[in-house]
A protein has these predicted regions:
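Short glycine-rich His-centered loop
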Residues: 3-31
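Short helix-capping segments at alpha-helix termini
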Residues: 101-105, 127, 280-287, 380-384
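Flexible glycine/acidic-rich beta-alpha junction loops that bind and position SAM and/or redox cofactors
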Residues: 12-16, 270, 325, 329-330, ...
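Catalytic cores of alpha/beta
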Residues: 119-124, 303, 363-378
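Radical SAM [4Fe-4S] cluster-binding motif and immediate context
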Residues: 180, 185-354, 359-361, 374
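Short, solvent-exposed turn/loop segments enriched in Gly/Ser/Thr/Pro and often Arg
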Residues: 39, 59-60, 85, 263-268, ...
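Radical SAM enzyme core and accessory elements
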Residues: 2-3, 72-78, 410, 414-500
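Glycine-rich beta-alpha loop elements in corrinoid/cobalamin-binding modules
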Residues: 38-39, 45-175, 398
Length: 500
């Protein structure tokens, strides 16, 4: 049985659609292709169990739709698995209709956070064969392959339309598999080289791991805006030893120099201590640099000291806003005081903190949003952060924030195509142009003389220089992403596929 793990290319005037491994979605003018870790696990697990697997990321490979279709014509897969998010789901519905007309005997499955929230919607709007809910695409796709090839009963979390038109399902998805049972990702099968150039990697080549699924912060259900609260209801993590094994393999076999572990929040406590000590004991510290997502207030100063010794570099923090009322409404469970202290510790022990910030909350005034901009500038001027990502807050369908929008009448549109960060989707005291202006203002912190001077002084190697040059390119790309008039309405209809 041949199985294609697929990201069919979307040719858009908005830019390059980046949906793989992204909790948020955006079209980019200067794209960074992120390694789709869970689909890569799926490919590796299926291959390990004897299935013929192809990796067809048409977006990262920059294929045209016609080139992607020609490849699938040649490969003739029995099953195509497609990951989607809200802003791409309508396009993929159109694609699936055309794919089923062209390949009527190929089974097509769709997966992702959006279809997890609304599984019946894809069955109603496309001839897709199966909707996979939950985030464990690896275990779920193995279940589907075993069902199709051997008649084994499907695990919970599948939706499909029966021959009589009745929608059926196997019940609510259950996150009950042991992630330690998974094989290490087959990096060659999953074309690791497509994803080595990432704006966040200072030392190239770099790659991604994901030791946990997904975030251990789930108080009140977790952050209200996070789309992955729908796919990962509980926190699961592999052992520190398994990640150390993977890190060592990546360094020795592929010459990887930097890794970002994209677990929603990296494990803390004794797990972190064991991992850091293992990096030192295996003589991996600084031979390969480590990055991760972390929460403000989650660690103590001694933890950051240990991480510094273990070779951690890039640490991503979700600041989101500098207004406590917003942090409370988002259920972040953090404060500005924690942010300041955490960033000071991380920078003190040699790490490069990265901030994610969002603009356009329904309850924030212009003054509130400006307060966030000024707090971020203060952090950068103090030297406590090195990079940032500024975006427009999106109420992804199915999230707690989206339900709040529905209850309060905050939504400006329910056209999924427009949930792509090119415009504000929620009613707000701010105009759309003000949201974009504030977002651009955040990126202009990189142009301040003090920041530029500090970065110039810090350049000590070719890696430093190359990283700074890439940073300039990405900053100008982001300024273009949020330029006035950058929003476009729904993309043109997908071109009909012709047999060649």
């Amino acid at each position: 049985m041949r199985i294609s793990i697929s990201y069919p290319p979307i040719e858009s005037r908005k830019g390059v659609p980046l949906l793989a491994q992204n909790r948020q979605f955006q079209y980019f003018n200067e794209p960074t292709y992120i390694y789709p870790v869970i689909p890569a696990y799926a490919a590796s697990l299926l291959d390990d169990r004897g299935y013929d697997v192809t990796w067809d990321d048409g977006i990262a490979e920059r294929l045209s739709l016609k080139e992607y279709v020609a490849r699938q014509d040649f490969q003739s897969p029995d099953l195509i698995a497609i990951e989607t998010k809200a802003p791409t789901v309508k396009t993929y519905w159109r694609y699936i209709k055309q794919f089923k007309e062209r390949w009527p005997h190929t089974t097509i499955a769709i997966m992702g956070d959006h279809v997890t929230a609304f599984p019946e919607e894809s069955l109603e709007n496309s001839p897709v064969d199966y909707v996979i809910t939950g985030g464990d695409y690896d275990f779920q796709l193995l279940s589907l392959a075993e069902h199709l090839s051997k008649g084994v009963a499907l695990s919970p979390g599948f939706w499909w339309t029966d021959k009589d038109g009745t929608v059926k399902n196997t019940g609510v998805y259950q996150q009950n598999n042991d992630v330690n049972d998974l094989p290490l990702i087959d990096r060659d099968l999953t074309k690791w080289w497509l994803y080595v150039k990432n704006g966040n990697f200072k030392y190239e080549p770099g790659t991604y791991t994901m030791v946990g699924r997904d975030c251990w912060w789930r108080q009140g259900g977790g952050c209200t805006f996070c789309s992955w609260t729908m796919t990962y209801k509980k926190y699961q993590v592999r052992t520190p030893e398994s990640l150390l094994e993977e890190v060592e393999m990546l360094h020795k076999r592929y010459g990887i120099r930097e890794i970002f572990d994209d677990t929603g929040t990296f494990p803390a406590g004794n797990w972190l201590v064991q991992f850091c000590n293992g990096m030192v004991e295996r003589d991996l510290a600084f031979k390969i640099r480590i990055g991760c997502n972390m929460r403000f207030g989650a660690l103590k100063e001694e933890d950051y000291k240990l991480m510094g010794k273990a070779g951690f570099r890039f640490i991503l923090y979700g600041l989101e806003s500098a207004n406590q009322k917003t942090l409370d409404r988002l259920q972040k469970g953090t404060t500005n005081a924690q942010a300041w202290e955490t960033l000071r510790w991380a920078s003190k022990y040699g790490m490069d903190p990265h901030l994610t910030i969002m603009m356009g909350y329904p309850w924030e005034t212009y003054e509130d949003a400006r307060n966030t901009v000024e707090f971020a500038k203060k952090v950068f001027r103090a030297g406590y952060a090195e990079t940032l990502q500024a975006t427009i807050v999106m109420p992804y369908p199915g999230t707690m924030l989206w339900h709040q929008c529905k209850e309060n009448g905050w939504l400006l549109t329910e056209d999924y195509d427009r949930y792509d960060m090119r415009e504000a989707i929620m009613k707000s005291p701010l105009t759309n142009d003000q949201v974009k202006e504030l977002t651009q203002d955040l990126y202009r912190v990189f142009m301040e003389p003090r920041y530029v001077a500090r970065k110039l002084v810090s350049i000590r190697s070719r890696d430093d220089l190359a990283f700074a040059q890439r940073g300039v390119k990405y900053v100008y790309g982001h300024l273009k992403d949020f330029a006035k008039g950058s929003e476009l309405n729904s993309d043109e209809e997908a071109e009909p596929l012709q047999r060649g």
